[in-house]
Amino acid sequence: MGWSLRMWIVSILVLTQLVNGALCWGDAGHYAVCKIAQSYFEEDTVVAVKKLLPESANGELAAVCSWPDEIKKLPQWRWTSALHFADTPDYKCNYEYSRDCPKDWCVTGAIFNYTNQLMSTSENSQSIVHYNLTEALMFLSHYMGDIHQPLHEGFIGDLGGNKIKVHWYNQETNLHRVWDDMIIESALETYYNSSLPRMIHELQAKLKNGWSNDVPSWESCQLNQTACPNPYASESIDLACKYAYRNATAGTTLGDYYFVSRLPVVEKRLAQGGIRLAGTLNRIFSAKRKLARA
């Protein structure tokens, strides 16, 4: 099966899930992050991203941002499974790259890796290594969403909440899925008439109003770095301890209070993920950076 056909099938599956309401950070959340990012692309980034996207995406990065989730269980892609998270020691509530990303094999390491691969398009490199830059773009875009989900930097002992069995209202599930899926799904049903575009529009409005003063600091990187995922991981485990794990022990029923008090955290992380993805891609594809390195 050719690349274009495989990507067309994956895109149809993702769009079908969105229409039918099978929504989670793995599809609705990632779609939102990438859709928000697209609205903050600089002109050079728009051109570069469209060149790299498969034809099936029709110029929409958001259409393929769930691709890494779609493929990670396939035999040839199982090696990518560990790149979606960075587990941290139980109850320490902090993140350290040297401790939590052994051999660079975690979500932060993946963000650095795929950033470097995409940067190869901006450098006069004589390297004999030829990367698949379409895959690099989709992996980077997806992992930038993952790192902003607090439980993707959760405790190693419970696998980021996957081992914590809870009820979301009357549905049996686990804590990780609550944050991947159910908070977003409940928000769509409760506030947005099950419309993902309406939710994204509301987040974009908040970025122009309530969060507008925060956007410059969200999108920037210290020390003139192109990518800076370590602070994002630190934020996530801090939020996991303060919000995700709190009052959510095994056997707990999570309802209105948990939903209403945690939804603002989820919404802000989606917005931050979008802004930071745009900032990273803008730095990668900036014409000024290309000229500076020429």
UniProtKB/Swiss-Prot annotation:
Monomer. Endonuclease that can use RNA and single-stranded DNA as substrates. In contradiction with PubMed:23620482, cannot hydrolyze single-stranded DNA and does not cleave mismatches. A divalent metal cation 2 binds at H152, H176, D180. Optimum pH is 5.5 with RNA and ssDNA as substrates. Keywords: Disulfide bond, Endonuclease, Glycoprotein, Hydrolase, Manganese, Metal-binding, Nuclease, Signal, Zinc. Belongs to the nuclease type I family. GO terms for biological process: DNA catabolic process. This is Endonuclease 3. It is an enzyme of class 3 (hydrolase). It comes from Arabidopsis thaliana (Mouse-ear cress). A divalent metal cation 1 binds at D69, H84, H142, D146.
